[in-house]
Regions:
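A structural signal for short, well-ordered beta-strand segments and their strand-loop junctions
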Residues: 51-53, 132-135
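Short acidic/polar active-site loop segments enriched in Thr and Asp
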Residues: 129
Length: 255
């Protein structure tokens, strides 16, 4: 009996795919992604035209299959898109958009792929304009921008930061963490850092007000002391005048 093989049925994805990315290797990797994601979301809190994600799968199969052609950048930003929650980034459901900026957080097990295979993918297929990588333990840090279809290394500025033309922000290392900086050189704060800064500002204002109050109290005490001294001098003069009058001496005729 001849067995008839059933034709392979393509696996089409559901409308919203979950990310297939594995857990991050170390707490420092997780912390780095949280810093990048939360600081940028806070800094662009008034914008609705971008999507930023960390450790999320990007599905980009030309056949719209979920089981082929997928990658998971550690951190990426897509510009000129709707800002809303997603479980993954599915290129064919996003008007063919790929990330504008990618940051890979290197580890010993992924560094070779990030420096080579992924770099070529982001350059030749995704055409991602800005690509950075950073090793949270060795502090290896490089960035590339797409020029005429090829990645060109971005030069460091005086602070050893790299400029992202897509983000209009600097990317640089501070306290062994990769951070964003404004064109003016100000650190892009996380929500926690902003709250701490606000608390510090309130505390400084409180201390300033307390210092002003103490200064005002000291000025009031000085004025009271001067008034008391004047009053004591007046009383002494009155007593002396009275004694002179008792002695038959007119104090107004003295002197």
């Amino acid at each position: 009996m001849v067995q008839i093989q059933k034709p392979e049925i393509p696996t089409f994805p559901p409308e919203d795919l979950w990310s297939d990315e594995p857990p991050l290797e170390t707490y420092r990797h997780l912390e780095e992604l949280i810093i990048l994601l939360t600081s940028l979301n806070r800094f662009w809190s008034d914008r609705t035209d971008f999507f930023a994600a960390g450790n999320m799968t990007v599905y980009y199969s030309s056949r719209q299959r979920k089981d082929e052609e997928l990658r998971g950048p550690d951190f990426f930003v897509v510009l000129n898109t709707e800002r809303r929650e997603r479980k993954s980034w599915v290129v064919w459901e996003e008007d063919g958009k790929y990330p504008n900026v990618i940051i890979e957080v290197l580890s010993d097990s992924t560094a070779t792929v990030d420096r080579n295979k992924k770099k070529l993918l982001y350059q030749d297929v995704w055409r991602t304009p800005d690509y950075f990588w950073f090793h949270p333990y060795t502090m290896e840090f490089k960035g590339f921008t797409l020029v005429h279809g090829k990645y060109v290394e971005i030069p460091l500025n005086e602070q050893s930061w790299l400029w992202s033309d897509e983000l209009q922000l600097y990317v640089g290392i501070l306290n062994e963490r990769l951070r964003f900086f404004t064109p003016e050189g100000e650190l892009v704060l996380t929500p926690e850092e902003e709250a701490d800064a606000e608390r510090q500002k309130v505390e400084e204002e409180r201390q300033k007000a307390e210092l002003e109050r103490q200064r005002a109290d000291a000025e009031r005490q000085r004025a009271d002391a001067e008034r008391q001294q004047v009053e004591e001098e007046r009383q002494k003069n009155a007593i002396l005048r009275q004694k002179l009058l008792e002695l038959g001496i007119n104090p107004d005729e003295i002197g």
